[in-house]
């Protein structure tokens, strides 16, 4: 396959899987070898084994990193620090795309960024929604309350059950009035962890104090 033919076929694809490029009558290995040559020449960018995007000059579709995060490893949904920044619950927007998965913990670093996946048990793998991002590309992201609970659980060793100041002092949580206490408790219960439930309760009290002082 010539590069011009390949580009014509995939120019509107937001992500390219090598398995989708195999032409009738061509072996998978031949396609993989060809993709490797185009990668070395800079025409395509490798995100992980068998997964690529076109280089910036040739790509017609915008780059949506949350969408890529869903596609690179899954099942997964965007959560933790990136989701907290997305919802404005912390002041900074995080550059790394942080996600939760029911699979093992994983990390990919490539030209599109750093994609971090943290494991939670299957029972706790819920509380996410499908949203539309850049270029109309849809991706799964935690609900605001689930992003908080995922963050608390996966950083549980850093929290005490009697120190509400840490939420504002160390992590600078903000805009917490939009969060629902019942949802926070419901999501925390999924993890079946006593300390998490206590920390989630402390966080809810912190939110109530902030709301009362507003």
Task: Name each region found by the language model.
Residues 128-214:
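Hydrophobic alpha-helical interaction segments
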Residues 18, 80, 184:
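Generic structural marker for isolated residues within well-ordered, non-membrane alpha-helices
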Residues 1-75, 111:
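Short beta-edge/loop segments at beta->alpha junctions of small alpha/beta modules
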Residues 62-63, 126-128:
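Short small-residue beta-strand/loop micro-motif enriched in glycine and branched aliphatics
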Residues 27-28, 90, 194:
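Short coil/loop linkers at secondary-structure junctions
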Residues 38, 83-84, 188:
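Hydrophobic alpha-helix position signal
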Residues 31, 76-80, 144-148:
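Amphipathic alpha-helical interface surfaces
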Residues 46-55, 65-124:
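Short gly/ser-rich loop at a beta-strand->alpha-helix junction or flexible surface loop bordering the NTP-binding
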């Amino acid at each position: 396959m010539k590069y011009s033919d390949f580009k014509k076929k995939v120019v509107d694809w937001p992500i390219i899987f090598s398995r989708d490029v195999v032409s009738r009558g061509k072996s998978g290995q031949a396609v993989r070898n060809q993709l490797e040559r185009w990668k070395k020449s800079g025409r395509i960018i490798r995100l992980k084994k068998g997964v690529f995007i076109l280089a910036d000059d040739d790509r017609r579709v915008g780059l949506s990193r949350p969408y890529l995060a869903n596609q690179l490893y899954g099942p997964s949904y965007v959560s933790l620090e990136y989701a907290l920044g997305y919802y404005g619950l912390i002041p900074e927007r995080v550059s790394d795309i942080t996600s939760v998965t029911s699979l093992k913990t994983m990390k990919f670093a490539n030209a599109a960024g750093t994609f971090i996946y943290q494991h939670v048990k299957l029972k706790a793998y819920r509380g996410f929604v499908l949203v539309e991002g850049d270029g109309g590309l849809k991706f799964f992201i935690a609900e605001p309350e689930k992003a908080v609970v995922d963050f608390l659980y996966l950083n549980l060793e850093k929290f005490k059950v009697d120190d509400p100041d840490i939420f504002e002092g160390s992590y600078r949580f903000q805009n917490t009035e939009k969060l629902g206490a019942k949802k926070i408790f419901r999501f925390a219960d999924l993890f079946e962890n006593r300390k998490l439930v206590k920390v989630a309760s402390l966080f809810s009290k912190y939110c109530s104090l902030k709301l009362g002082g507003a």
